[in-house]
């Protein structure tokens, strides 16, 4: 089971492990502003009575899902169609779509450094503009070929870590389907997603992929590979997950403690092997 985040000020409700990486928890007031209004105003409109039985937590999770979807779709710099957003993410939340998009735009800009821009009013398509310096953008999350792994791979790494460092392939696809990524369908950006995750990422040593014995139907499990441990860390991945949910990494106490221990173990050999300076 995923660990639910610790709420700020009052206990958070139990997160559905099929819906996110561990829940969005409670948030404090935001000072960031989006185009057309303040973040606080947008949050208030999400809480309006028109949303019926939906809870604030459900709406926050939908915003997080939309942010992930936009980040993935932007990988090939092809305009993101509103029809795809409505089909793959928004679903029956169409009545609050403008506010969901506004909050997602705020999070993309103030957390990830991307500005969500509508190409033309009549085109109903969007692009993300990188507001950061090219050298700084995703600097900690690039592979040896300069490709950011903060897209699909980063999401898979986050799923693995938040599920206790091992996740079944079935659980991965249950999550990715909500982002419009299917194991049996060719994807515009990723080509063959199943091959990318279970073969390419495995061959590059970002992931380990093993069959789970005595399962019917047959299932597989995924874990971090040795290259992941060299190029990133549990703390960086946890911070990525926290950014998507607009939370603090400490809101997941179990994972945060594990990430801290990982940071300490990484620093220890470097300290021990540091050459002594002569006086």
From Swiss-Prot:
The modification Phosphoserine is found at residue 38. GO terms for cellular component: chromosome, telomeric region; cytoplasm; nucleus; Smc5-Smc6 complex. Residues 59-259 form the MAGE domain. Residues 30-48 have a biased composition (Low complexity). GO terms for molecular function: protein dimerization activity. Residues 52-279 are annotated as: Interaction with NSMCE1. This is Non-structural maintenance of chromosomes element 3 homolog. The lineage of its organism: Eukaryota, Metazoa, Chordata, Craniata, Vertebrata.
């Amino acid at each position: 089971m995923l660990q639910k985040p610790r709420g700020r000020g009052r206990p958070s409700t139990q997160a559905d492990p099929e819906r996110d990486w561990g829940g969005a928890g409670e948030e404090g007031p935001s000072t960031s502003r989006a185009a057309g209004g303040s973040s606080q105003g947008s949050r208030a409109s999400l809480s309006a009575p028109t949303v019926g039985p939906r809870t604030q937590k459900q709406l926050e999770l939908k915003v997080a899902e939309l942010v992930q979807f936009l980040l993935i779709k932007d990988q090939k710099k092809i305009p993101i169609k509103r029809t795809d957003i409505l089909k793959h993410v928004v679903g029956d939340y169409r009545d609050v779509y403008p506010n969901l998009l506004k909050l997602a735009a705020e999070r993309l800009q103030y957390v990830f450094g991307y500005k969500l821009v509508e190409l033309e009013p009549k085109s109903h398509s969007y692009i993300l503009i990188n507001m950061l310096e090219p050298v700084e953008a995703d600097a900690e999350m690039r592979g040896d070929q300069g490709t950011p792994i903060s897209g699909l791979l980063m999401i898979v790494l986050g799923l693995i870590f938040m599920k206790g460092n091992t996740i079944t392939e079935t659980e991965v696809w249950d999550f990715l389907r909500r982002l419009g990524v299917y194991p049996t369908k060719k994807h515009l950006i990723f080509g063959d997603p199943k091959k990318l995750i279970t073969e390419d990422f495995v061959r590059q040593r970002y992931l380990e992929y093993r069959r789970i014995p005595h399962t019917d139907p047959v299932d597989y499990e995924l874990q971090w590979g040795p290259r992941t441990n060299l190029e990133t860390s549990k703390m960086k991945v946890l911070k990525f997950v926290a950014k998507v949910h607009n939370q603090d990494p400490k809101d997941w106490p179990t994972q945060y403690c594990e990430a801290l221990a990982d940071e300490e173990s990484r620093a220890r050999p470097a300290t021990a092997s540091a050459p002594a300076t002569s006086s």
